């Protein structure tokens, strides 16, 4: 059975790329067409790449490896933390500190400091032997460490591979992984460089539902790998969300062939393209040049009924 269906990818807006003026020519082979100034990603290729990445992550974890989940943009923060915690893997969803991989020995010392501060009762002025001001300074230090390092507190060595949402934003993490020859599994939007990624998944890295779906798929691969590692059943696999269950129940016979992908994409309406443009989180060209990413609306949330019917 396929890891994910074509219908799930379409409904999550995985096929929406960036505006045509913001693209990387190296991504041309992963693009299906262009419509209304928006690139449409070839989901038929995405399906095969998802299966390949899924198998790699599963085998890596089954042989004792670990996967670090990385995504600091607003659209990815919640799903990165939720899915990583579900399968007990390290994650970074707030800010990437330079040297988290290449200088892990120093980072590990900061983790030890965070654990040391956990033993302090910041409200016990009399028993601590410290003044209120000193306790306040320590509390602020602890809060800062928890925010940046809380997701990797149990990590004792560099990960076996990394899952990254938006390789452009997380370019420091990509560079560090490449220096250490750590395989990179990532979503490739139409403005990304595929040469930086070992296991590519062409797709939308701006829409919340797209990021959530693909991150859940990777987490499911980790869960299955853990099951193989321990030689037993695992209950870590997350049940489908209600909207995903409705999709599958409403169309059990949906085929994932290339002809369907072509027909569905060509039948999409202009409002969908507008949603895709909004999903980029770049309302203005100036914002795009500045690199700031606002929280994007979910692509496909309000897709016209006729688009669903075409699928």
Swiss-Prot record:
Taxonomic superkingdom: Bacteria
Signal peptide: none
Residue ranges, compositional bias (Low complexity): 269-311
GO annotation terms (biological process): translation
UniProt region (Disordered), positions on chain: 251-311
Gene Ontology molecular-function annotations: structural constituent of ribosome
One annotated Gene Ontology cellular component of this protein: cytosolic small ribosomal subunit
The entry's keywords: Ribonucleoprotein, Ribosomal protein
Keyword Ribosomal protein recorded: yes
The keyword Ribosomal protein belongs to this UniProt entry's keyword annotation: yes
Family affiliation: Belongs to the universal ribosomal protein uS2 family.
NCBIfam families: rpsB_bact
Protein name: Small ribosomal subunit protein uS2
Natural source organism: Kineococcus radiotolerans (strain ATCC BAA-149 / DSM 14245 / SRS30216)
Gene name per UniProt: rpsB
């Amino acid at each position: 059975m396929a890891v994910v269906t074509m219908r799930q990818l379409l409904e999550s807006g995985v096929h929406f790329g960036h505006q045509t003026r913001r693209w990387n020519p190296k991504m041309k082979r992963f693009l299906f067409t262009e419509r209304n100034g928006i690139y449409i990603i070839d989901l038929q290729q995405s399906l095969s790449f998802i299966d390949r990445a899924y198998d790699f992550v599963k085998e890596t974890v089954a042989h004792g490896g670990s996967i670090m989940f990385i995504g600091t943009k607003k659209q990815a923060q919640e799903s990165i933390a939720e899915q990583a915690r579900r399968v007990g893997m390290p994650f970074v969803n707030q800010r990437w500190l330079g040297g988290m991989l290449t200088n892990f020995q120093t980072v590990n010392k900061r983790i030890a400091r965070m654990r040391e501060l956990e033993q302090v009762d910041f409200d016990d002025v009399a028993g601590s032997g410290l003044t209120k001001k000193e306790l306040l300074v320590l509390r602020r230090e602890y809060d800062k460490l928890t925010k940046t390092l809380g997701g990797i507190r149990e990590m004792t060595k560099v990960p076996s591979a990394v899952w990254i949402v938006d390789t452009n934003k997380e370019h420091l993490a990509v560079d560090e992984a490449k220096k250490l020859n750590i395989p990179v599994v990532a979503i490739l939007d139409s403005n990304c460089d595929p040469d930086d990624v070992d296991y590519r998944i062409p797709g939308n890295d701006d829409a919340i539902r797209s990021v959530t779906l693909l991150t859940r798929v990777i987490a499911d691969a980790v869960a299955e790998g853990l099951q193989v590692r321990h030689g037993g059943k695992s209950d870590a696999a997350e049940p489908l969300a209600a909207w995903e269950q409705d999709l599958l129940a409403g169309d059990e016979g949906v085929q994932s062939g290339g002809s369907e992908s072509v027909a569905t994409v060509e039948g999409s309406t202009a409002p969908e393209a507008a949603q895709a443009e909004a999903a980029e989180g770049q309302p203005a060209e100036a914002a795009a040049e500045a690199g700031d990413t606002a929280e994007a609306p979910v692509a496909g949330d309000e897709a016209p009924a006729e688009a669903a019917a075409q699928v």
